[in-house]
Structures are given as C-alpha cells and as structure tokens.
Amino acid sequence: MAGRRQGTVERITSETKIMADLTVDGEGKAELRTGVPFLDHMLSLFSVHGFFDLKLQAEGDLDVDAHHTVEDIGICLGGALAKALGDRKGIRRYGHAVVPMDEACASVTLDLSNRPFLVYRVPTLAARVGRFETELVPEFFRAFCQHGGATVHVQGLYGSNTHHILEAIFKALGRALDQATRFDERRSGIPSSKGTL
C-alpha cells in the first residue's frame, strides 16, 4: 500500500475561512495558525503523538467568540481525514489509547466505521483555560466525528487540572487514531464483515 495518504479541505463561510491539510503517514509535524492558541497547542500534541503532519490555517469571527472557528476546524480536520483514508481498505479501523498527564488520565476509543457518533464523558472542567472556552471541546469532537466518519468515545477518567485533562485527551486522540489508520498486513479489503463501511 504505497504512497502517503493525504487529504485537504477548504471551507469558506460568512463566519470562517479554513484550510486543513492532513497527512496520515507523517512525522508528527504541525503548522498551525488558527487564531486560537490553546487549540493550536492541543492539535500540535495530536499531531506529534499520532505521527500526523497537519497544516491548518483559520480565520474566523473571533471578535464574537471562538465557537464557529473551533467547530469549523473540527469539520475540516474530519473531512481531511476522510479524504486521506479514501475507501479505508486495509486499515485496522479500531484504536484505543489511555494517556496520563500528571494527576490526570484520559482515554479515547474510536472506530473508523463511517458511522459518526460521539460519546463525551469528561468531568466538569474550569470554564476557561486562558481565553479558551472549554465547552468548545465537545463541539470540536462532534464536528470531527461527523465529517471524519468516526465513532469516538472520549473519557476524562480523572484529574483536577483542566489543562492536564484536555492535554491527555488530545494526546490519546492522536495515539488512538494512529492505531486505527495503520495498515493491517493481514487484510487487503474493507475491514468489515459487510464488505463496506
């Protein structure tokens, strides 16, 4: 299965202008300019721990708030993943990771099934980390699942520091997605008994 799997999505609305370029078979390099520094930090961790190369540029109505920008980044990242994976032949499909970050621990379990679904079970977080509103994290994940064709279960297992909990979550997302997107040398076709995803 030669070639680097790569997908690019551009989205322009009255609220945002976003370009996402994702290389699944990458080295963990990230070039991020979203205007939302904390999200840049989280997506950099996602890239490093998943060995994904991610280029992301975003302009949004941040004078209102970051909601539209964060959600549309999830849309574009999910769409870029779907494009990069194509028909999903030969991939492992499932991934799971548990990641500690100091006192916090989080798990992400996912299925690249083309059946978008999000389970988000995270303890109550501080309302903000810096200027970033933490209620936007499930909005990001929901959009990512919908446009990436993924079922994703996110669990903040425990922790007291909001930054640490979210950092563990995004690292776990990278590691779980790395597992799920790898090729299984025992399989050449679609990873489903139905023959399609």
Curated annotation (Swiss-Prot):
Enzyme class: lyase
A GO term from the CC aspect: cytoplasm
Subcellular localization, as worded in the UniProt entry: Cytoplasm
Catalytic activity entry: D-erythro-1-(imidazol-4-yl)glycerol 3-phosphate = 3-(imidazol-4-yl)-2-oxopropyl phosphate + H2O
Biological or metabolic pathway of the protein: Amino-acid biosynthesis; L-histidine biosynthesis; L-histidine from 5-phospho-alpha-D-ribose 1-diphosphate: step 6/9
Keywords in alphabetical order: Amino-acid biosynthesis, Cytoplasm, Histidine biosynthesis, Lyase
GO BP annotations listed: L-histidine biosynthetic process
Keyword Cytoplasm: yes
PANTHER family: IMIDAZOLEGLYCEROL-PHOSPHATE DEHYDRATASE (PTHR23133:SF2), IMIDAZOLEGLYCEROL-PHOSPHATE DEHYDRATASE HIS7 (PTHR23133)
Family, as annotated: Belongs to the imidazoleglycerol-phosphate dehydratase family.
UniProt-recorded name of the protein: Imidazoleglycerol-phosphate dehydratase
The species this protein was found in: Syntrophobacter fumaroxidans (strain DSM 10017 / MPOB)
Gene that produces this protein: hisB
